[in-house]
Amino acid sequence: MMIIVMLILSYLIGAFPSGLIIGKLFFKKDIRQYGSGNTGATNSFRVLGRPAGFIVTFLDIFKGFITVFFPLWFSVHADGVISTFFTNGLIVGLFAILGHVYPIYLKFNGGKAVATSAGVVLGVNPILLLILAIIFFSVLKIFKYVSLSSIIAAISCVIGSIIIHDYILLAVSGIVSIILIIRHKSNIVRIFKGEEPKIKWM
């Protein structure tokens, strides 16, 4: 029972719409009506500016990061294969990612999973996050597309999990990669059409 409560709480925390709340509280803007219409960090930068964008990014990362430690904080007794699986920090963090992407508060239409996924990886393996961040910013420096950089970093995580034989990480990163590609489908189309806006700060 406690495992179910933990997973639901992780989802609900992940579903907290940081960008929407910051936009409405401090800018009187619903960021869903501007830019890409997304509630995540990238659109927050675009619509609300850098300071607010950094705050939203921090909050979205923190959502994923904190949930990784739920199995340590909750009195969870894992006495079998299934219970052990669902008390793994990566799996608990995955529920936060799902909450961020499909928030119950916003009719299941949320962000694109990038920052919250980074928070989960930070909590589980900071060195891996550093490697993925280097890949992300390297691709961003070359191509100037946040969407492309995010997808390549996610796929790199899948490849890395195969190399280190971490199959739970493989499962989670595989799911996240699929979600990222689906959520960035319109961005991918615009990239091929040459219509995707490029960042200007790098």
Curated annotation (Swiss-Prot):
Transmembrane segments: 2-22, 54-74, 81-101, 120-140, 162-182
Source organism, top-level taxon: Bacteria
Enzyme class: transferase
Cited InterPro entries: G3P_acylTferase_PlsY
Entry GO terms, CC: plasma membrane
Subcellular location: Cell membrane
Pathway: Lipid metabolism; phospholipid metabolism
MF-aspect GO terms: acyl-phosphate glycerol-3-phosphate acyltransferase activity
Disulfide bonds: none
Catalytic activity: an acyl phosphate + sn-glycerol 3-phosphate = a 1-acyl-sn-glycero-3-phosphate + phosphate
Any GO BP annotation: phospholipid biosynthetic process
Entry's EC annotation: 2.3.1.275
This protein's UniProt keywords: Cell membrane, Lipid biosynthesis, Lipid metabolism, Membrane, Phospholipid biosynthesis, Phospholipid metabolism, Transferase, Transmembrane, Transmembrane helix
Pfam family, one: G3P_acyltransf
Membrane topology of this protein: Multi-pass membrane protein
Subunit structure: Probably interacts with PlsX.
HAMAP family reported for this sequence: PlsY
Protein family: Belongs to the PlsY family.
Function of the molecule: Catalyzes the transfer of an acyl group from acyl-phosphate (acyl-PO(4)) to glycerol-3-phosphate (G3P) to form lysophosphatidic acid (LPA). This enzyme utilizes acyl-phosphate as fatty acyl donor, but not acyl-CoA or acyl-ACP.
Listed name of the protein: Glycerol-3-phosphate acyltransferase
Organism listed in the record: Staphylococcus epidermidis (strain ATCC 12228 / FDA PCI 1200)
Chain's gene name: plsY
